[in-house]
């Protein structure tokens, strides 16, 4: 009765030795297949055949432009990424059998996504705005308006707002105030004084010229002439005893406007009102 349990234990050990239990888990960098724990292929290699009771896992290196970046049991390697220049892409880091190619954007462009499958141009900050944050390969330009005391007169994706020039530090005076798009204009104090005095001098000279022209015009204006003195008519007497003298009525000769005028005797000598004046 005592020997039976002992025999059962012996038979159980024998059967276990002949038919071992399949493992339920494998170690790191191994995989379970056909009740066997086979080694994974290292990065840069692909699986050709699984291991057996008598052979190890068979792996081969990836081909040109291919890669595998982890311990694996893949039968095919992955193709390297293509950086399409038509999309603004260029190779930042060439791929190997263990790493993929890394693409980035051309200068002045940035990726539209984390995968960087295409690019767009950086934004430029217009005049009056400066660059707060310069664009990177994966982010766009960030602009900000120039505050008081600063300006930007260009459209740029790199220029920040510049401070106004300090005229005082150069012993100059401000001739024109700055804006968010223009710098302060400085100049010497003598020039500023001249800019004030010269227009005043020109104004005075212009006023004098106007007065002289007015006086000249007044001097040329004709004055009223004094009236000619009224001349009394002169009587011309002819002797009666001259031969061939005419016995007709005597004729008087007067002056009309300094010209002799014949007046018959016996008629009154009258001068028109207009002639008297």
Curated annotation (Swiss-Prot):
Cystine residue pairs: 26-37, 38-51, 41-59, 62-77, 83-103, 105-119, 111-116, 125-143
Give the record's glycosylation annotations as residue positions: 153, 180
- The TNFR-Cys repeats extend over 25-60, 61-103, 104-144, 145-187
All ranges on the Extracellular side of the membrane: 21-193
Tell me the outcome of changing residue 39 to T. Answer: In bladder carcinoma cell line Hu549
Would you name any one GO CC term? neuronal cell body
Q: What is this protein called?
A: Tumor necrosis factor receptor superfamily member 5
């Amino acid at each position: 009765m005592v020997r039976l349990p002992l025999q059962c234990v012996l038979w159980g050990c024998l059967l276990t030795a002949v038919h071992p239990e399949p493992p339920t888990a494998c170690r790191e960098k191994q995989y379970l297949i056909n009740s066997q724990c086979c080694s994974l292929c290292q990065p840069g290699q692909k699986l050709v055949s699984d291991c057996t009771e008598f052979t190890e896992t068979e792996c081969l290196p990836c081909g040109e432009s291919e890669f595998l970046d982890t311990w694996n049991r893949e039968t095919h390697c992955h193709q390297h990424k293509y950086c399409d220049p038509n999309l603004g892409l260029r190779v930042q880091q060439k791929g190997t059998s263990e790493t993929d190619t890394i693409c980035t954007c051309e200068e002045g462009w940035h990726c539209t996504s984390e995968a960087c499958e295409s690019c767009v141009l950086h934004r430029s900050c217009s005049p009056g705005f400066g660059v707060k944050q310069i664009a990177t390969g994966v982010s766009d330009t960030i602009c900000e308006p120039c505050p008081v005391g600063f300006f930007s007169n260009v459209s740029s994706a790199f220029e920040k707002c510049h401070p106004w020039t300090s005229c005082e530090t150069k012993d100059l005076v401000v001739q024109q105030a700055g804006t968010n798009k223009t710098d302060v204009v400085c100049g010497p104090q003598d020039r500023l004084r001249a800019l004030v005095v010269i227009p005043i001098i020109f104004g005075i000279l212009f006023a004098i010229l106007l007065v002289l022209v007015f006086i000249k015009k007044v001097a040329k204006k004709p004055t009223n002439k004094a009236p000619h003195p009224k001349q009394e008519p002169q009587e011309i007497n002819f002797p009666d005893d001259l031969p061939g003298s005419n016995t007709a009525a005597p004729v008087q000769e007067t002056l009309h406007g300094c010209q002799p005028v014949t007046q018959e005797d016996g008629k009154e000598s009258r001068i028109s009102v207009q002639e008297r004046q």
